[in-house]
Curated annotation (Swiss-Prot):
Protein name per the record: Elongation factor 2
Broad enzyme group: hydrolase
Pfam families in the record: EFG_C (PF00679), EFG_III (PF14492), EFG_IV (PF03764), GTP_EFTU (PF00009), GTP_EFTU_D2 (PF03144)
Diphthamide modifications at: 700
Length: 843
């Protein structure tokens, strides 16, 4: 095998046509890490014999122990193509050597933020789908994320060995199963028609679908078989490819192809006849140890085995034979090289997704052309904890220019605004490193189009940042990432020994760096809160916190707490008025719920404060039935200027209105961050400023007078508009055999869940159940479910939506009012809610 050095890798890094940056994405347990192993083995990093069992990219102890991937891990692979195989390659290339930067990402939904970070710095994705389970919820979520980032997918149908060994399906049935899986994936991809990307769907007959068995380390695309038969029958390779998939049948008796099954017993579909049956035959021969038949068959295929390998029996024999005949690495790496874009191609169409500034300045042009001599543009997508405790590598991708050891860079954080000093640092890179699985190799410099890890920047980057070098023209940062899940589960942590407090504070800072999604905050009552995407995610984070970031100091954690949101379900019963502290200014306001779907549109970023007001008012008028003029009078969104609440100006001819606009908005940001019920964020409320009466002297209507008044009037208008609590709801997908359905339903009913879809997977005994489950009830759900179904059901929870609670929090004794009292008690507020009379004034 090739053992390559860092210098060789560095040489290929300059050939930007020969680089492929790709991530491996899939549903949990569909075999990503196992498949990645075969690729790593081909590059000579681990031995072929153990591939499939090592899971090289699961570098953490708890990953190996749980058998799941938690963090996304990068590896650089070197691969040399033969001239023969490159004959049909039409794109630009420099020589035969290729560099593949591969990132193995987690499939478990709690870690989907890791996937987002991986996707940002790659251009192509290998989507792994289990041939029997098919396209699952998480496959769909991740695929949509990838297409949203304009990443070109190729598909592999994995766990083929199950078809031959476990289920013993016959050819036609297998073909139907595979074609259904591919069709389901294409349905998702078809919704992303992008003129720049072209057609993103995958087709076996074009070579963009592979069939693999990660555990046994073999895989094929139809290209492999087409090549083999083309020389044998003397037909053109491309013609043979088309015949190996779809409605093409071959009858060996008459030696003719036809478009439909002629009904004769020997007539079979092309795929079955030429791909499926030969594999099935060889596997059967190996498993039955009929070696006298096996060697002549292999000789025909041109496969030679070493003498010691001929001694093997049963499964090990089959594994070696299949690996020698159809090595997974060759099939998959060739598919990536042929069908995934190089950085040079990809950055042309990705630049508008990546760059925030004008698309014609020098930085955008450097990204578009992937120019190594242009200005540096580098996006850090995550921080990786180094082996010496407390230090981090900044891991990211160079989009333009070069990054080298000792170079001075400008670090632009997520809140940086061009032309201002906020969130901007200048620092030099201590050294640049490339990642090769468990070890790192230091290199002098890394040119654009590659992934890189840097040492020495960890004090200045929290989660992600953009790096550029010093230039006269300020660069705009690269867009921040959008996560598909939100941190809704929180725990309070404290130290067992009070003297460990400084360790805890330091540890929380490091934890916030190491995970792209965790939010660590400190409440006013002084407790430290850690928020994550779900139970498993939090568990892993707290384990990291205790073992890695606090040096093993013990921590106590509270029961998990769920964030709620506050909303209203009706228009205010009357217009409420509040007076300023000096009694000279009066604000009149009403609250009303937003239209259906508007809050979600703001969350997704389709409507936001930075949009062009003309476009925004058009969307609001057409989709949500707003008045055209009203849509132009939105003052602000909140909380944090982008949240799903807004203030709209409904005043007619009021003097000095513009002077107090900023103060009202400031009061609104404050109020929408902590509502009157339990100081939780507001959601989906539209506040209308009806009238304002102001003092004529400017000194009596300053911010100190208006801001608290605005906050009080907002609270009063919310309380008069039938306030309600919103609770977060998971969508749970459960796969289970029919016998386990009863247990699933009973557990869901205890937990206030309800099933909204149940379907049987065609061709399998499994049922797919989708249900809604309130996050509050989800703790311990998976262990209860496994107990009730004796381990046959496997749940996946994804945050889905906010559900309004039907009970009224203002009436004592209802479920909502008990919840409000609990939250207030936990936050150290008075248990009784502040009455309306405190917020509303009489004339």
């Amino acid at each position: 095998m090739v053992k390559f050095t860092a210098d060789e890798l560095r040489r290929i890094m300059d050939y930007k046509h020969n680089i492929r940056n790709m991530s491996v994405i899939a549903h949990v347990d569909h075999g990503k890490s196992t498949l990645t192993d075969s690729l790593v083995a081909a590059a000579g990093i681990i031995a072929q014999e153990v591939a499939g069992d090592v899971r090289m990219t699961d570098t953490r102890a708890d990953e190996a122990e749980r058998g799941i991937t938690i963090k996304s891990t990068g590896i650089s692979l070197y691969y040399e193509m033969t001239d023969e195989s490159l004959k049909s390659f039409t794109g630009a290339r420099d020589g035969n050597e290729y560099l593949i930067n591969l990132i193995d990402s987690p499939g478990h939904v709690d870690f989907s933020s890791e996937v987002t970070a991986a996707l940002r710095i790659t251009d192509g994705a290998l989507v792994v789908v289990d041939c029997i389970e098919g396209v699952c919820v998480q496959t769909e979520t991740v695929l949509r994320q990838a297409l949203g980032e304009r990443i070109r997918p190729v598909l592999t149908v994995n766990k083929m060995d199950r078809c031959f060994l476990e289920l013993q399906v016959d050819g036609e049935e297998a073909y139907q199963t595979f074609s259904r899986v591919i069709e389901n994936a294409n349905v998702i991809m078809a919704t992303y028609e992008d003129p720049l990307l072209g057609d993103v769907q995958v087709y076996p007959e074009k070579g963009t679908v592979a069939f693999s068995a990660g555990l046994h380390g073999w895989a094929f695309t139809l290209t492999n078989f087409a090549k083999m038969y083309a020389s044998k029958f003397g037909v053109v390779e491309s013609k043979m490819m088309e015949r190996l998939w779809g409605e093409n049948f071959f009858d060996p008796a008459t030696r003719k192809w036809s478009g439909k099954n002629t009904g004769s017993p020997t007539c079979k579909r092309g795929f079955v006849q030429f791909c499926y049956e030969p594999i099935k035959q060889i596997i059967a021969t190996c498993m039955n140890d009929q070696k006298d038949k096996l060697w002549p068959m292999l000789a025909k295929l041109g496969v030679s085995m070493k003498n010691d390998e001929k001694e093997l029996m049963g499964k090990p024999l089959m594994k070696r034979v299949m690996q020698t005949w159809l090595p997974a690495s060759t099939a998959l790496l060739e598919m990536m090289i042929f069908h995934l874009p190089s950085p040079h191609t990809a950055q042309r169409y990705r630049v508008e997704n990546l760059y925030e500034g004008p698309l014609d300045d020098q930085y955008a042009n450097a990204i578009r052309n992937c120019d190594p001599n242009g200005p540096l543009m580098l996006y850090v997508s995550k921080m990786i904890p180094a082996s010496d405790k407390g230090r981090f590598f900044a891991f990211g991708r160079v989009f333009a220019g070069k990054v080298s050891t000792g170079m001075k860079v400008r670090i632009m954080g997520p809140n940086y605004i061009p032309g201002e000093k906020k969130d901007l640092y200048t620092k030099s890179v201590q050294r640049t490193v490339i990642w090769m699985g468990k070890r790192q190799e230091t290199v002098e410099d890394v040119p654009c189009g590659n992934t890189v890890a840097m040492v020495g920047l960890d004090q200045f980057i929290t989660k992600n940042a953009t790096l550029t070098n010093e230039k006269e023209v300020d660069a705009h940062p690269i867009r921040a990432m959008k996560f598909s899940v939100s941190p809704v589960v929180r725990v309070a942590v404290q130290c067992k020994v009070a003297s460990d407090l400084p360790k805890l504070v330091e540890g929380l800072k490091r934890l916030a760096k190491s995970d792209p999604m965790v939010v660590c905050t400190m409440e006013e009552s002084g407790e430290h809160i850690v928020a994550g995407a779900g139970e498993l995610h939090l568990e892993i984070c707290l384990k990291d916190l205790q073992d890695d970031f606090m040096g093993g100091a013990e921590i106590i954690k509270s029961d998990p707490v769920v964030s709620f949101r506050e909303t209203v379900c009706d228009r205010s019963t009357r217009t409420v008025m509040s007076k300023s502290p000096n009694k000279h200014n009066r604000l009149y306001m009403e609250a009303r719920p937003m239209e259906e779907g508007l809050a979600e549109a703001i969350d997704d970023g389709r409507i936001g404060p930075r949009d062009d007001p003309k476009i925004r008012s058009k969307i609001l008028a057409e989709e949500f039935g707003w008045d055209k003029d009203l849509a132009k009078k939105i003052w602000a969104f909140g909380p944090e200027t982008t949240g799903p609440n807004m203030v709209v100006d409904m005043c007619k001819g009021v003097q000095y209105l513009n002077e107090i606009k900023d103060s009202v908005v400031a009061g609104f940001q404050w109020a929408s961050k902590e509502g009157p019920l339990a100081e939780e964020n507001m959601r989906g409320i539209c506040f209308e400023v009806c009238d304002v009466v102001l003092h004529s002297d400017a000194i009596h209507r300053g911010g100190g007078q208006v801001i608290p008044t605005a906050r009080r009037v907002i609270y009063a208008s919310q309380i008069t508009a039938k306030p309600r609590l919103l609770e977060p709801v998971y969508m749970v997908e459960i796969q289970a055999p029919e016998g386990a359905l009863g247990g699933i339903y009973s557990v869901l009913n205890q937990k206030r869940g309800h099933v909204f879809e149940e379907m049987q997977r065609p061709g399998t005994p499994l049922y797919n159940i989708k249900a809604y489950l309130p996050v509050v009830e989800s703790f311990g759900f998976s262990s209860q479910l496994r107990a009730a179904t004796s381990g046959q059901a496997f749940p996946q929870c994804v945050f889905d939506h906010w559900e309004m609670m039907s009970s009224d929090p203002l009436e004592p004794g209802t479920q909502a009012s008990v919840l409000v009292a609990d939250i207030r008690k936990r936050k150290g507020l008075k248990e009784a809610m502040t009455p309306l009379s405190e917020f509303e004034d009489k004339l």
